[in-house]
């Protein structure tokens, strides 16, 4: 169901407004056309940074100095972005939701091209050409993009390519196999490959993004297994103290210290993925209660 409230899209727009579009933008939050016009201006400014659709460039990549995951973030709306690098993290950040709320299909083909090109041989957003930078959080950003495409009924991938839900499930299934009970009592490491810097670090964004995907898959499919993983991952993060009793979210901890000595730097995107996942879990539980009541 397409959300009719322009205030929902205004939240998306306010996130985009942090991208630093050139010049002042007039915005009336009580006027749908004003919101869409402002969003269009910012979307154009953001997409001007993207070169993956040009001859000789790679779809789904941003030019230096941006990382692969940042392009994945461009494809999915995240409620917040990392405050120090706002202009970097979410430049493509609402292209699926931009289409969903405005009906503007101008960037749909570019979005589709990028999403499909980066799927990887195992259809789980682990392309071989990204092994030097591919962490669990990086992969999860693309998984969240695929899940957003499923949730918003974005155009299906070309024939022969799995659907968006299947691709998001591929990311989830791959990451459940990486759950590491041998160190820190559980959790995902930051990096997948031991040769990458950060392999011995368990960070909040990797585990938070996994929680986000699990919670949203639970809501989308009604499958309790996803909900169980969402609960398990959140409980682990909370048990380590990465989320404090007053919901302050730290960045992560090293396995050498059993994840007890943490980097307490607080990035807003860490909190953001948990907020979105928590909302999905709230709706999932509410739906279960409703269905039980109907029976």
Enumerate the predicted regions with their spans:
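Well-ordered alpha-helical scaffold segments within catalytic/enzyme domains
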Residues: 24-29, 72-86, 90-105, 141-159, ...
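Alpha-helical junction/boundary sensor with strong preference for TPR arrays
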Residues: 50-54, 85, 122, 153, ...
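Aromatic- and glycine-enriched pocket-lining scaffold segments that form the walls
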Residues: 165-236
């Amino acid at each position: 169901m397409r959300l009719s409230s322009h205030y929902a899209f205004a939240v998306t727009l306010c996130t985009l407004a942090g991208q630093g579009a050139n010049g002042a933008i007039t915005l009336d939050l009580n006027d749908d056309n004003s919101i869409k016009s402002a969003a269009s201006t910012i979307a154009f400014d953001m997409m001007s940074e993207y070169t993956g659709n040009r001859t000789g460039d790679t779809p789904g990549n941003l030019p230096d100095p941006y990382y692969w995951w940042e392009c994945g973030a461009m494809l999915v709306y995240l409620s917040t972005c990392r405050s120090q690098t706002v202009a970097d993290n979410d430049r493509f950040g609402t292209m699926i939701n931009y289409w969903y709320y405005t009906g503007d299909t101008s960037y749909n083909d570019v979005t589709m091209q990028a999403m499909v090109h980066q799927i990887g041989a195992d259809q789980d957003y682990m392309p071989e050409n990204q092994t030097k930078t591919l962490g669990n959080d990086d992969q999860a950003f693309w998984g969240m993009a695929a899940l957003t495409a499923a949730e918003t009924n974005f155009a299906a991938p070309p024939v022969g390519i799995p659907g968006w839900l299947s691709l998001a499930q591929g990311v989830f299934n791959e990451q459940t196999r990486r759950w590491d009970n041998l160190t820190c009592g559980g959790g995902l490491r930051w990096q997948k490959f031991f040769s990458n810097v950060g392999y011995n670090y368990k960070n909040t964004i990797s585990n938070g993004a996994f929680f986000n995907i699990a919670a949203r898959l639970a809501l989308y499919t009604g499958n309790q297994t996803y909900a169980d993983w969402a609960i398990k991952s959140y409980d682990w993060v909370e048990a380590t103290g990465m989320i404090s009793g007053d919901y302050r979210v730290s960045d992560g901890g090293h396995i050498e210290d059993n994840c007890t000595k943490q980097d307490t730097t607080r990035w807003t995107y860490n909190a953001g993925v948990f907020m979105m996942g928590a909302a999905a879990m709230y709706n999932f539980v509410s739906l279960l209660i409703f269905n039980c009541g109907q029976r």
